[in-house]
Swiss-Prot record:
Residues 286-447 form the Helicase C-terminal domain. Residues 60-255 form the Helicase ATP-binding domain. It comes from Cryptococcus neoformans var. neoformans serotype D (strain B-3501A). It is an enzyme of class 3 (hydrolase). The Q motif is unique to and characteristic of the DEAD box family of RNA helicases and controls ATP binding and hydrolysis. This is ATP-dependent RNA helicase DBP10.
């Protein structure tokens, strides 16, 4: 495996250094072997210069034979185009109709929609570029009206109707963009053939290969051809390719750019130390400073209005914070994973079009979303891992723009702040004690009073949401991953340091004089909070009593004795150290000495960059522990019985024990081709039901492809028995032939269902039900009956007749 960064990937594009091959418009793209139609589409969309990750990833992806690539670059560096350009170059711009040729897997629906939009827009420019430079054959085809069709794209995500996705996949799309769960559902339901697949792209690969998508990816990868090309991209990728062994990589090229610089240099980080009861007030103070006061008149240009993304821990936090901000006066959108797909799209579209000021989300929107002109990100709840923090703050400071990330830190978050400091480094972040700031006390107290008193009276439903949020917060704190043990020790020292010297107020709030006054208030409040009385509770109010005087004298005597003992121990340790010290260790004039240690041949006790790689790693402590667990078989006869009994559960409807079919919660499971257990709902027969409905509709291009060229004629292949269909008694029908139709018993002239066939006698083959397609005679008779009823109902009653 090659872990290199090509030198040409880091070259600058300064004036005068461009070679002849890269001269002219799009010359730098031509140097990467990008086709002219694709270059034209890129230039139309103002992509004139490739980014470093694009320079490093595109040439090996277009090489012959194509190489597997693991690409890592910071957020906002153009990773989407780094894999879309080679993909469009290989698939071309025309539809082949042989099934999917490329698959893009994404961990979230919003990211899939974004890639779908960017890819179709880029391919549309390629199709428009085909109008120039046609050859004779293409001119003849255009004259005959047989022009080639453009690429077909399919977006397969959860939360949407299955029938529409059946139709998309039946039309044999060229490029499929999907989330793993829904795509696996369609694969199993439709028995999809993926042998023509050439390229598989894993966007946000570290998230896809975590434990949450393990079963889905295992089954999808089992059905993919072994000759495919794999492209894995993310902003946080570990250097160990062994963590992606399931992807089936062959001689992969690892491209890691900006590995030392995990986040954008244009991103400013601000950390505020707050108390748990002041988080809501702190959020309002930040929003008022960042966005402005609520209920302000809309500016003339809505696109220039500032916006902010607020990241919270759970969906209960989303509901509470969003309702709090709405009540305060901010236009707010919200997104979380269990929200309906239509609602998610509407909320995100409203935020993109500046119909809302604040977007409150969980980590579902922390990856890949590219929201233009996003300058502010607020971490209401601090993330439990450095990778999540990198993806959260990566929503701002993208494509050369500047941005700011604000984080609210409570005392319980100090270990995770120390973890982040170890991951980013002191040069980028600074020491935790130095970077922590505080908010103005007066503004905090005003907003605390507003949230917990005024709002509770005017909006009592917020109190109920707050109680639900607190329960969710407790569950979140118990379930989130633990920080490094070293970080807990650092957090204790950080907390003690802040108790003696509280953090100063950030410069973004007030001028110098007011800041000094507020800092004096903060120091005074910190001293009051840290004050511990020397008297016990039993001595309060009894200073002149005899017992209080005795206790005071006793305490004074003990304090003086402790001071004498500590002073004697310090003098003794100093004297013993001087007595035992040899002559050569006594203080002597220091001469300049030479250090002969060669840093290039010096071995540290830890590997360089080990902490950063630990932050990038996909396996948490829980996953590593689960991999070390071994199930043991019982060594006596009662063991198997107990194991078998544990697989049974009581069914309250059937009033008996039933066997669980694989799932721990009793959900029915089926075994796939790879041996994995999947929910039985993945093979529910919905596709066959949809197919049976479609086969009686007029044959179009989609139906013809879905049914293998349309409906067959009356005569099937030789030797095959003809089925009973359309009311025609075939060889498999219950009757003897066409003469026996309609002679079943139980029909009468006065009945509307006299054409319905009898199910037949028990023990014999019954006549099969009609497939639903009526003959011309049936339609004519049905119309006659309907007309007679209409005429009968239209007649006037006898008493009104003349």
């Amino acid at each position: 495996m090659a872990a290199i960064t090509p030198s040409w990937a880091l070259e600058t594009t300064a004036d005068g250094e461009v070679k002849e091959k890269t001269s002219g418009p799009g010359g730098q793209w031509r140097a990467l072997n990008v086709g002219p139609d694709l270059i034209r589409s890129l230039l139309i969309r103002k992509f004139k210069t490739p980014t470093p990750i694009q320079r490093a990833a595109i040439p090996p992806a277009l090489s012959t034979p194509p190489r597997d690539i693991l690409g890592m670059a910071r957020t906002g560096s153009g990773k989407t185009l780094a894999y879309l350009i080679p993909l469009l170059q290989r698939t071309g711009s025309t539809h082949h109709g042989q099934g999917p040729r490329a698959l893009i897997l994404c961990p979230s629906r919003e990211l899939a929609v974004q890639i779908y939009t960017v890819g179709k827009d880029l391919a549309r420019g390629m199709n428009k570029g085909k109008g120039k430079g046609k050859n004779k054959n293409e001119d003849e085809e255009d004259e005959e009206g047989k022009g080639k069709e453009g690429l077909r794209w399919a977006l397969i995500i959860g939360g949407e109707g299955m029938d529409a996705q059946f139709e998309k996949m039946s039309s044999n799309p060229d490029i499929v963009i999907a989330t793993p769960g829904r795509f696996l559902h369609l694969i199993v339901e439709m028995h999809m053939d993926l042998r023509h697949l050439q390229t598989v792209i894993y966007d946000e690969a570290d998230r896809l290969f975590e434990m949450g998508f393990d079963v889905q990816l295992q089954e999808i990868l089992h059905r993919l051809p072994s000759t495919r090309q794999n492209l894995l991209f993310s902003a946080t990728l570990p250097s160990s390719v062994a963590e992606f062994a399931k992807a089936g990589l062959v001689n992969p090229l690892l491209v890691r750019l900006d590995a030392e610089q995990k986040i954008s240099p244009d991103l400013a980080l601000k950390f505020f130390s707050v108390k748990p009861g002041e988080k809501e007030a702190s959020l309002l103070v930040l929003l008022r400073e960042v966005i402005g006061k609520p209920n302000q008149p809309e500016p003339a240009d809505p696109s220039s209005a500032p916006q902010a993304i607020v990241f919270v821990a759970t969906k209960h936090h989303v509901d509470y914070v969003a309702e709090l901000l709405r009540t305060t006066g901010y236009r707010t959108s919200l997104i979380y994973s269990s929200l309906d797909q239509v609602a998610r799209q509407q909320q995100l579209a409203g935020f993109r079009s500046h119909q809302s000021d604040v977007l409150v989300v969980t980590d579902v929107a922390a990856r890949g979303l590219d929201i233009p002109i996003m300058d502010h990100v607020i971490n209401y709840d601090f993330p439990a891992g450095p990778r999540i923090f990198v993806h959260r703050v990566g929503r701002t400071a993208r494509a050369g723009r500047k941005g700011t990330a604000y984080s609210l830190i409570v005392k319980e978050d100090f270990p995770y702040l120390c973890d982040l400091h170890t991951f980013l480094g002191t040069e980028r972040m600074g020491e935790p004690a130095d970077v922590l700031r505080s908010l103005p006390i007066e503004q905090l107290s005003e907003n605390v009073e507003y949230v917990f008193h005024n709002l509770d009276e005017t909006a009592p439903h917020i109190t109920a949401l707050r109680n639900v949020m607190r329960k969710g917060q407790g569950m979140f704190e118990r379930s989130r991953t633990k920080a490094n043990p070293t970080s807990y020790r650092q957090a204790k020292s950080l907390a003690s340091a802040l108790s003696n010297n509280p953090p100063r107020i950030d410069d973004m709030f007030e001028d110098a004089m007011e800041v000094e006054v507020n800092e004096e208030k903060a120091r005074l409040l910190a001293k009051v909070a840290a004050f511990t009385p020397s008297e016990t509770v039993f001595e309060v109010g009894k200073r002149e009593s005899e017992s209080a005087i005795i206790m005071k004298k006793r305490r004074k005597t003990v304090d003086e004795r402790q001071k004498r003992v500590s002073k004697a121990e310090a003098e003794k340790s100093t004297a013993s150290g001087m007595e035992k010290a040899p002559v050569k260790e006594l203080p002597a004039p220091q001469l300049p000495s030479k250090n002969f240690k060669d840093p290039s041949f010096y071995l540290d006790h830890t590997q360089r960059g080990a902490e950063a790689e630990k932050g990038y790693s996909l396996k948490s402590g829980v996953e590593s522990l689960s991999g070390a667990i071994t199930d043991m078989t019982a060594d006596e006869g009662t063991g198997p019985k107990a194991q078998k009994a544990s697989q049974l559960s009581w069914d309250r409807k059937k009033h008996k024990f039933i066997k669980k079919n694989g799932s721990a919660d009793g959900e029915k499971m089926i075994k796939s081709e790879s041996g994995a257990l999947l929910p039985a709902s993945y093979s529910s027969g919905k596709y066959q039901e949809w197919k049976s409905k479609r086969r009686h509709m007029p044959d179009g291009p989609v139906e013809a492809l879905a049914l293998g060229g349309g409906r067959r004629g009356r005569h099937g292949p030789p030797g095959q028995k003809r089925k009973a269909e359309d009311g025609d008694g075939g060889e498999d029908a219950g009757g003897k032939g066409r003469k026996d139709q309609g002679k079943s018993k139980g029909t009468g002239k006065g009945k509307d269902d006299f054409k319905q066939k009898s199910p037949g006698k028990p023990g014999k083959k019954g006549i099969k039900q009609s497939s639903g397609l009526k003959s011309a005679m049936d339609i004519r008779k049905q119309r006659e009956i309907a007309q007679k009823r209409k005429e009968k109902n239209a007649r006037k009653p006898q008493k009104f007749r003349k």
